[in-house]
């Protein structure tokens, strides 16, 4: 049998293009017609889409998860941070952290308004998925720090230094269908979590929804 993983909204922005790749569209349409194939979805919105097109035949709902041991038990208390990150720690202000893609679905305006309070150091790890970060002008905020990506094997050491971990996404068709892996990694770190009002984040009592 064919197993089709349906883990994101079919949106060209996720592919970094203006149009959805033809092969992606064709695989989706073929799967929606062939009810013998197994479809695995990770979010309620994706499940509703499948149900509307082919019913519940061979449909599996499986939200994302986490390597709990890696994020909870493999934090190195003697990890040597580079100077740039160490200097942020030395400022002594509460640190708000995010890691992941910086893309069109990221709420830059919200982060900018948070930075303008002057109460926090905001640390962003990840990749610039498109030109949205430059257009947002966050680099002009002295307390916003984009530090690039970090290897998965040491990422937990940086995240563990944050006072709050966040997922500040805009609410749109992409994020309505997102079950963020980082959400479960944040949980394993046992840190306060604040997100925007995403359906898949609302499911968990440990997540605070910002408005």
Where are these regions (language model features)?
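Short hydrophobic "strand-cap" motifs at the C-terminus of beta-strands
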Residues: 42, 96-100, 125-126, 147, ...
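Carbohydrate-associated surface elements
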Residues: 45, 62-65, 74, 162
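Nucleotide-activated donor-binding/catalytic signature segment of Leloir-type glycosyltransferases, i.e.
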Residues: 93, 126, 132-159, 208-209
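Acidic anion/phosphate-binding donor-loop and adjacent secondary structure
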Residues: 14-17, 66-87, 104
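Conserved donor-binding/catalytic core segment of Leloir-type glycosyltransferases
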Residues: 85-106, 111-115, 119-125
């Amino acid at each position: 049998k064919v197993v089709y993983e349906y883990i994101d909204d079919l949106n060209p922005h996720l592919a970094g293009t203006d149009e959805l790749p033809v092969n992606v569209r064709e695989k989706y349409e073929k799967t929606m017609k062939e009810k013998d194939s197994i479809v695995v979805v990770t979010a309620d919105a994706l499940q509703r889409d499948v149900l509307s097109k082919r019913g519940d035949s061979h449909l599996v709902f499986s939200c994302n998860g986490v390597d709990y041991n890696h994020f909870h038990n493999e934090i190195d208390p003697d990890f040597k941070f580079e100077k740039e990150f160490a200097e942020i720690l030395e400022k002594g202000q509460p640190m708000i952290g995010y890691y992941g893609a910086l893309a069109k679905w990221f709420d830059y305006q919200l982060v900018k308004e948070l930075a303008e309070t002057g109460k926090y150091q905001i640390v962003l790890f990840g990749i610039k998925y498109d030109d949205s970060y430059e257009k947002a002008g966050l680099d002009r905020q002295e307390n916003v720090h984009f530090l690039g990506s970090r290897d998965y094997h040491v990422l937990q050491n940086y995240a563990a230094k944050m006072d709050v971990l966040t997922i500040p996404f805009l609410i749109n068709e992409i994020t309505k269908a997102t079950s963020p892996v980082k959400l479960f990694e944040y949980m394993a770190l046992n840190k306060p979590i604040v997100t925007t009002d995403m359906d898949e984040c609302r499911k968990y009592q440990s997540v605070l929804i910002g408005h």
